[in-house]
Regions:
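Active-site loop/oxyanion-hole signature of alpha/beta-hydrolase fold enzymes
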Residues: 48-56, 79-83, 92-135, 151, ...
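Short beta-strand/loop motif that positions the catalytic acidic residue
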Residues: 246, 252-254, 258
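Catalytic histidine-centered segment of alpha/beta-hydrolase-like enzymes
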Residues: 284-297
């Protein structure tokens, strides 16, 4: 199988031979999911509202699927899905502001859920896409809610994976503030290890050391992106009251062993969204698309085939 994935052979301003964050992520995925890439564009980024957004673009048929990555990873986490889903339709995987190959401004006003959603809308305009299927995992789900709130006419279907509709609790808000202070003081390295423990299931961390290391690499993003995303997440609005108004086909996905957004949270969203479907992935934690890629891909493919 030959995939047409638009990606850059060199990031402008970087030394020759040094790959972008997305390319490092793609290379770090297990070899059974390695992308066989044919480059279509010399530089895969879009200028939107004064910032440069990096993205991956594979496949052809529409409506396109837009994959929204988790915190604190970048779009490289979607390599198994880019390979599988793009055999049937176009797949876009952008880096959020502050992550991967996208710009990482220090100005915190740029980092809000609405800001991420507006930049995504600008990217879709750049790509000529009017309506898309949104698939958001964890923070990507928060952005999906923001996009659906602001641009409902541009969403044809929705996949919500390892995420929640509720806003942060007071404890979660304070924890994110402490994490921001820690990053500002000593950088991301120590926090990275703390976050990593919650992203993967105990089973994965005990038996798949390669995936643990690959996930660690996917988390190597600018400090400004970390701090900005934490700011956006702790101030995100509660979307629980909006669930009943979601009218597009929706698939809710969760790893059986996810401790950050556990199955009971997924079921509460399922109950709130009219006609929604649920997929629980066995022995997978928060990053179910990497821990159980075959099951994740199968569930999404089946869902899309019926839309």
């Amino acid at each position: 199988m030959r995939l047409a994935v638009r990606a850059s052979t060199r990031w402008p301003g970087r030394p020759a031979g040094e790959s972008t964050g997305v390319e490092r992520g793609l290379q770090a995925i297990p070899s059974s999911f390695a992308l066989r890439r044919r480059y279509r564009e010399p530089v895969p980024f879009a200028e939107v509202d004064g910032v440069r957004l990096h993205y991956c673009d594979a496949g052809a048929s529409e409506p396109a699927v837009v994959l929204l990555h988790a915190f604190p990873l970048h779009a490289g986490m979607w390599a198994p899905q880019l390979e599988h889903l793009s055999t049937g339709r176009r797949v876009i995987a952008p880096d959020f502001l502050g992550f991967g190959g996208s710009d990482a401004p220090d100005s915190m006003y740029r980092y809000t859920m609405l800001g991420y959603a507006d930049l995504l809308a600008g990217l879709l305009d750049h790509l000529g896409l009017v309506r898309v299927v949104l698939c958001g995992l964890s923070m990507g789900g928060y952005v999906a809610f923001a996009f659906l709130r602001q641009y409902p006419e541009r969403v044809s279907a929705l996949v919500l994976a390892a995420t929640r509709a509720a806003a942060d609790t007071t404890a979660a808000f304070e924890r994110r503030t402490d994490q921001q202070d820690q990053i500002a003081g000593i950088g991301t390295a120590a926090l990275l290890e703390v976050l990593l423990a919650g992203l993967l299931s105990d089973h994965t961390r005990a038996t798949r050391l390669d995936l643990v290391e690959q996930t660690r690499r996917l988390m190597a993003n600018p400090a400004a992106g970390y701090i900005g995303a934490l700011e956006a997440m702790k101030h995100r609005p509660d979307a629980t009251g909006e669930l009943a108004g979601i009218t597009v086909p929706t698939l809710v996905m969760v790893g059986e062993d996810d401790t950050l957004s556990p199955p009971d949270v997924a079921r509460s969203m399922l109950d709130g969204i009219p006609g929604a479907e649920l997929a629980v992935l066995p022995r997978a934690g928060h990053l179910s698309n990497l821990e159980a890629p075959e099951e994740f891909n199968a569930a999404v493919t089946d869902f899309l085939s019926r839309q």
